[in-house]
Amino acid sequence: MEPALAEEWLEWMNEVHIPQVMATGCFREVGILKVLTNAADDEGVNYSIQYRAQSLADYERYRDQFAPALQQETKARYGEQILAFRTLLEEIRPLSPLVH
């Protein structure tokens, strides 16, 4: 997204969108990461919002019952100003401190 939009978008995500997603009960954790490495031609600001579900069934329930309306709300608010895509990941090994 354009840098001028980033602060407002992040505030909206924290105050509106993420609470709506978490209120579905489909996820147990959420994290926001700022992407520091961008493609050479990308001068925008990029974030990764990561939701963690207890099970694949919880994710599928979110995808089928809640995601369409929430995605439409985001599109109505921001239109083509942001690019959003979803990637489903399976955790193989959780983050943990390095043990010597």
Regions found by a protein language model. Give the residues of each.
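Glycine-rich beta-strand-turn "strand-cap" elements at beta-sheet edges
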Residues: G31-D42, E73-H100
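Short amphipathic alpha-helical segments
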Residues: L5-I32, A69-Q72
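Hydrophobic transmembrane alpha-helix bundles
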Residues: Q20, Y59-K75, V99-H100
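Intrinsically disordered, low-complexity acidic/polar segments
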Residues: A6-E8, D58-E60, L95-S96
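Short, well-ordered beta-strand segments in beta-rich or mixed alpha/beta enzyme
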Residues: L33-Q65
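A short, structured loop/turn motif at beta-sheet edges
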Residues: A23-C26, Q54, P94-L98
